[in-house]
């Protein structure tokens, strides 16, 4: 696929990739969720170990300004980078990490994506290796339930024929029949990758009007006139955001065949 028209500020031809997990303790909707225990391990450690299952040997770092998180990661032998405690978002925290490292691309893995599977990470990493001139990748997945079209907690998007993300929103703007919309609208997953230059631009530029309106960070990139490449995954698992999510996640870990396989590898 031609990448003409994608964000072309990256000049790297041999990408040096890191998986980075930005983490903090003061989650508003579920305080201290980073260290919530699942099967004897903190949630963050589940995510870190899953990151290490990537087939490319890409290193996994946790970056945080919270001593509890730093200690927990170090106790398990993980790679950790100490950041300022106060950051506007995870991308800003990863930008601070990038300024201390020589990596060219950063796969940002959210610390609440406890059910991420290796093939999802590998799909993004492979795309970076094949097309390092692209500067922003975001994983997307088809919608499953019709109510996701209007559920504003589900961030959604429309794709172009070249896999470019055309627009991002919380409520579908389409007027077509629901079944047609279900075929056209995709869900944005909490897994994306970004080049060093694009990361700096995202972190240093002021928030844009649409970004503020929808509270969707990727909208800044599109508003500034740049483009995001989508990587489609056929299956998407929920993340941990609310107290009621904990029971659902626990059930999936015990009943989903692929999750059982991955869990055995990290415990």
Task: Annotate each language-model stretch with its function.
Residues 13-64:
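N-terminal glycine-rich phosphate-binding loop and ensuing alpha1 helix
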